[in-house]
């Protein structure tokens, strides 16, 4: 309903003004009509479903903002929302680099036919994830920015549905000054994006989704470099809100403002309590109805 849309916008506006009061500059992208069909010579998509999270398409490393390839057809044109802001940054800052990865064709060759069929049970899906057998093929480089975490000169990239090995290789070749490490999380039957799975909180501390633990051999990279990985607290909810396309583990997708301050969704009391005990100042943010 229109009223609830106004309410949802108000929640985002409140979050934005809270950040601004703390001295953080907040830029808001220009929304498109996400309901419109899109097409290329290779395919047609009925809507631009999912084209709203800036975190998913823009990868910021140093003075560069890179537009990711994206791997959903409906999100192919998502970058258009951010072009006005990117143009502004480019004009205002002589050192800003605006880059774009090669746009993938996303033909049928990019996807395994029937991979997402309802006939396939959860055990088989978990086995596939463990074997790194995903819905996307290695036809061409694919990656979403939301699969990447930056730790100084190290980029940690989740290999899963939305990022393939060719995409990780492309990032390695592109970021010559960085070390790129592939990670995967066998407990997730639908591995899309790293943010509700593996979250750095402050230097030396990462929270990891206990249902999707980083495999033992991959933990060494972090532990050998002084990073402790602990299980994230349980979510406060048993299911996501209506029409929400994310899991209940959005509870751990927090916003770290500085090494001592973190924003947590206000209903996620267990996650807030855990971060409080870890010495963080927790800012509760009312955002669940805007997911």
What does each model-found stretch correspond to?
Residues 1-291:
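The feature marks the mature, well-folded catalytic cores of soluble enzymes
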């Amino acid at each position: 309903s229109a009223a609830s849309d106004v309410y949802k916008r108000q929640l985002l506006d409140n979050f934005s003004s809270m950040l601004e009061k703390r001295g953080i500059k907040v830029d808001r992208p220009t929304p498109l009509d996400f309901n419109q069909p899109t097409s290329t010579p290779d395919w047609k998509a009925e809507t631009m479903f999912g084209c709203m999270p800036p975190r998913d398409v823009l990868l910021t490393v140093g003075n560069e903002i890179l537009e990711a390839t994206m791997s959903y057809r409906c999100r192919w044109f998502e970058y258009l929302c951010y072009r006005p802001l990117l143009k502004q940054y480019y004009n205002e800052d002589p050192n800003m680099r605006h880059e774009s990865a090669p746009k993938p064709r996303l033909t049928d060759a990019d996807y395994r036919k029937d991979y997402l069929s309802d006939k396939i049970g959860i055990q088989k899906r978990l086995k596939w994830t463990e074997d790194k057998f995903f819905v996307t093929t290695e036809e061409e480089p694919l990656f979403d920015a939301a699969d990447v975490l930056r730790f100084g000169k190290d980029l940690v990239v989740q290999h899963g549905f939305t990022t393939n090995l060719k995409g990780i290789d492309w990032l390695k070749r592109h970021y010559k000054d960085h070390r790129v490490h592939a990670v995967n999380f066998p407990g997730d039957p639908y591995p899309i994006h790293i943010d509700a799975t593996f979250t750095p909180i402050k230097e030396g501390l990462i929270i990891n989704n206990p249902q999707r633990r980083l495999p033992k051999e991959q933990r060494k990279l972090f532990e050998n470099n002084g990073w402790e990985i602990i299980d994230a607290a349980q979510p406060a909810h048993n299911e996501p809100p209506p029409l929400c396309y994310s899991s209940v583990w959005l509870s751990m997708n927090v916003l770290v403002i500085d090494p001592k301050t973190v924003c947590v969704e206000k209903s996620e009391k267990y996650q807030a309590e855990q971060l409080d005990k870890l010495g963080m100042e927790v800012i509760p943010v009312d955002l669940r109805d805007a997911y």
